[in-house]
From Swiss-Prot:
Gene Ontology CC terms, in alphabetical order: cytosolic small ribosomal subunit
Gene Ontology BP term (one): ribosomal small subunit assembly
Polar residues bias (residue ranges): 131-140
Function according to Swiss-Prot or TrEMBL: Protein S19 forms a complex with S13 that binds strongly to the 16S ribosomal RNA.
One Pfam match: Ribosomal_S19
Protein family: Belongs to the universal ribosomal protein uS19 family.
Alphabetical keyword list: Ribonucleoprotein, Ribosomal protein, RNA-binding, rRNA-binding
Top-level lineage group: Archaea
Classification via SUPFAM superfamilies: Ribosomal protein S19
Protein name: Small ribosomal subunit protein uS19
Organism, as annotated: Nanoarchaeum equitans (strain Kin4-M)
Record InterPro entries: Ribosomal_uS19, Ribosomal_uS19_CS, Ribosomal_uS19_euk/arc, Ribosomal_uS19_SF
Amino acid sequence: MIFSTMAKEFRYKGYTLQELEQMSLEELAKIMPARQRRTLLRRLKFGWSDQQKKLFKKILLAKEGKYKKPIKTHARNTIILPFMVGVTVHVYNGKEYVPVQIKPEMIGHYLGEFSFTTKRPKHSAPGIGATRSSAHVSKK
C-alpha cells in the first residue's frame, strides 16, 4: 500500500475556499445550515450590527496589513465567513479576550463557539460534614 502524505484540500459543502470567497452572501447563505442561513438573510435584509460592521472593517484592514493591533470583539454571535479566514480575533468570554485563529474549517460557525464562557470545575477533597461518615468527626 502506498499512502499519500499530501494534505487534503479544504472544501465546504463541495466548494473550495477560493470559490467561497468569490460567492455573494446570498449564494453563501443557500449552502449554510438553517440557523446560519436565517441569520445571514436577516443581516442582509435588516443590516449588520454596529459591532459586526466594526469587526468586518478591522478584519479587512488586518488582511491588507494596515491594522497591527489585536482585533478584539464582543460580537460572539457573528458567523465566520470566508473572508475572515487567516485572521486572529480576540473574542470576549465575559472575563477576558480569548484569541481565536480563524481556520477554513470554522466557516459557518459562530465566533462564540470557540471562546468558552465557563470553565470546568476543579473539585478539592470534601470538607468536614460533607459525607455521613465525616459528620461525627471533631472539627479540631
